[in-house]
Amino acid sequence: MQAPRELAVGIDLGTTYSCVGVFQQGRVEILANDQGNRTTPSYVAFTDTERLVGDAAKSQAALNPHNTVFDAKRLIGRKFADTTVQSDMKHWPFQVVSEGGKPKVRVCYRGEDKTFYPEEISSMVLSKMKETAEAYLGQPVKHAVITVPTYFSNSQRQATKDAGAIAGLKVLPIINEATAAAIAYGLDRRGAGKRNVLIFDLGGGTFDVSVLSIDAGVFEVKATAGDTHLGGEDFDNRLVNHFMEEFRRKHGKDLSGNKRALRRLRTACERAKRTPSSSTQATLEIDSLFEGVDFYKSITRARFEELCSDLFRSTLEPVEKALRDAKLDKAQIHDFVLGGGLHSHPQGAEVAAGLLQRQGAEQEHQP
């Protein structure tokens, strides 16, 4: 009997969510995890009895905030003294300490204080992606391509490779997320001649713009721009603050100091934000949110877009900068790809399309 052919998987190790795909029968299949979701939260939690990764880790974050680690991608390959690390630390409920100048997260695991490097946390997420792929393929997975942001430094790229090795993966290349997106859409196979592509990727924690040229299957990144602290989380924060104020106005209670209530509200806001773009409004229903008070509230899509209008506008300058740096005019873009969660928001799509003024550019959406 012939041994199964070894397959390499592709892993998008994201700041807030990760996913794994495999190329079969001429197309990329993004695989569902054990919860039936094609994206898995990049969360790792430690309890008195076990370690949780993904959906299970995120779902208990409200009850266990100090030992639930996320945003490891913001730490990986960086020094503890980096200004971005020092700034981010102020917003995390878990503790970050320095060891030899490198950041480590400190948690309580099985009753003991433990510290982990960001690569170790990321390796736990990568292991979850590996398990997801193995469950689907029915065979061991040893090889993986892992994507990183174009702006990642050599040390960040190497640390990501190290995370893959810790997870038991032989990392083939580390490739830029923008290049991976262009390949996924088959833009390298779209007719003869050189094509210019703009990737507009609003992820959970970062916003990245890349301009690529594709010629005879060869990809060249012409320019990159973006904001490493603009992403879906910022849109979530607007919703959380809006509903916190609504709760205070309606019930005269301030829940801003209650971490569990805030985490439950944030989870409900994330769910509301993912309401299909065909819907005109989303509803929050949270039983006993704070001091026994139930909270039921709706928000229209128009109101959401009004709350976030400045965030949508702030995506414009990075696009213009990327085009300037690539020495290209809007009219010279043949294709543009809307990635991350942006494609579900009509205003987000309108911002990108309006800025490029289409000019016959073909628009693609993330699956």
From Swiss-Prot:
Domain of life: Eukaryota
Keywords: ATP-binding, Nucleotide-binding, Stress response
Gene Ontology BP annotations: chaperone cofactor-dependent protein refolding; protein refolding
Cellular component annotations (GO), alphabetically ordered: blood microparticle; cytoplasm; cytosol; extracellular exosome; nucleus; plasma membrane
Signal peptide: none
GO molecular function, one term: ATP binding
InterPro entries xref list: ATPase_NBD, Heat_shock_70_CS, Hsp_70_fam
Family, similarity comment: Belongs to the heat shock protein 70 family.
Name of this protein: Putative heat shock 70 kDa protein 7
Organism this protein belongs to: Homo sapiens
Gene from which the chain derives: HSPA7
